[in-house]
Amino acid sequence: MKCSLIITTYNRPEALELVLLSVERQTVLPEEVIIADDGSDDKTQAVINNFQSNKILNIQHSWQEDKGFRAAKSRNKALSISTQEYIVLIDGDMVLHTHFIEDHLKHAQKGFVIQGKRSLLTKKRTSSAIKNQTTLFSFLDNGLQNHKNSLYSNFLSRLFASKKTHLKG
């Protein structure tokens, strides 16, 4: 199975750059990366152009005019141009674990949505990560605000995972 990775963003080119670096470092690359841009300026476009020129990722830029906060419309526009049957949605400040896409594809099942949690970095640790282009973080990192979400364990994942079949959408 292949997937589209949709990344929402708005005027945080330095964060988007770090996210795209983490995407390039995946053990399994997404078939396409679509940047769902809610009206960012030229600095975001420059970051996207730089990654497009690397040719490691197949990146499309789905941009809409800045008319206020319209993230849902931006995401929907990106969804409409995706070419894969499996979609992964993330925010433009989510640095991915190296197995993020691989794990999504491994656990994908028709009729189910996979939802996870993220680890939050302190403002100081975020600045440091952007400056040093750090995409790997340790469970013991002092800059984490919620350490438990940074644990990576297939055993624990299976132990705490739950399927909710009663939800309708």
Q: Predicted regions span which residues?
A:
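Cell-envelope/extracellular polymer assembly enzymes that use nucleotide-activated donors
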Residues: 2-4, 32
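Short, well-formed alpha-helical segments that are part of the catalytic scaffolds
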Residues: 12-25
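A conserved acidic beta->alpha catalytic loop
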Residues: 22, 29, 37-46, 68, ...
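Glycine-rich, basic loop-to-helix element that forms the pyrophosphate-binding segment
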Residues: 65-82, 99
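Short aromatic/hydrophobic "clamp" motif used to bind/position activated sugar donors
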Residues: 87
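Hydrophobic/aromatic residue at the end of a short beta strand that borders the catalytic acidic motif
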Residues: 90, 95-97
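Conserved donor NDP-sugar-binding/catalytic core segment of glycosyltransferases
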Residues: 99-136
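Short, flexible, basic/aromatic active-site loop/helix in glycosyltransferases
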Residues: 133-169
